[in-house]
Amino acid sequence: ATTKTLRILIDWEQGKVVWQQPRTPNATAEDWSKASHNLAYVKNYNLYITDNRGNQLQVSHDGSRELVYGQSVHRNEWGISKGTFWSPDGKSLAYYRMDQSMVTDYPQVDINNRIALCKPDKYPMAGMTSHEVSVGIYNVESRQTVWLDLGERKDHYFTGISWAPDNQSIYVTILNRRQNHDETWSFSALTGKRLQKIHEEDNEKYVQPQHPLLFLPWDDQKFLLQTENEGYDHLYLFDTKGNKLKDLT
């Protein structure tokens, strides 16, 4: 539970507060790990973590309106709704870094004030240069970031970020700019090295990756894949070597 000043963990069976932590004023995009009680958030364009002992760790230092950390990217397309992703043990944080310095401003009108205000937004018009996205992994214990080897095309779409249950690897779906081909790869969470392609989709019109992988709680070598690859939204059972084991729907 949260109040205006505190984040509180309550044991309902015992009827008492078992953990609490002060909230950071003006923090946005808060993402709390139930496993470690570490909290990620964005403030003044930079990404921070408050660990379970109350220490504030600054993950990024060069954030600005043009260089954005820990927030949703690609204009919330492809199932993207946030910019931080805790590992299952809550000790590592995957996050987006979006460089939009090359994107032109587009005028937006803010009508929340009595007199409307013009507030420019970074918006790439059709055919113009788009922003570039990277994915980093910050280790809370070492306080170091490694960057995933996503390839040379930083203007591709990167979505479906999902952690393996063992905290050692992470999965990302890479969608090309034409939006008709995607590949899902595993990466080392320790080095950022690209490990294995586990799934690929191709369509003459478009593909629509919308969902991260969902690992089975009782088998960390198998996961569910949700896709419209065959024309309708279906679930499939895969293993971590990329083998399709079963059509579930």
Annotated model-derived regions:
Residues 4-83:
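Asp-box/WD-like beta-propeller blade repeats and closely related beta-sheet repeat scaffolds
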Residues 27-31, 159, 208-214:
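Repeated scaffold domains used in trafficking and secretory/extracellular systems
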Residues 12-15, 51-54, 139-143, 189-192, ...:
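Short loop/turn segments that connect beta-strands within beta-propeller blades
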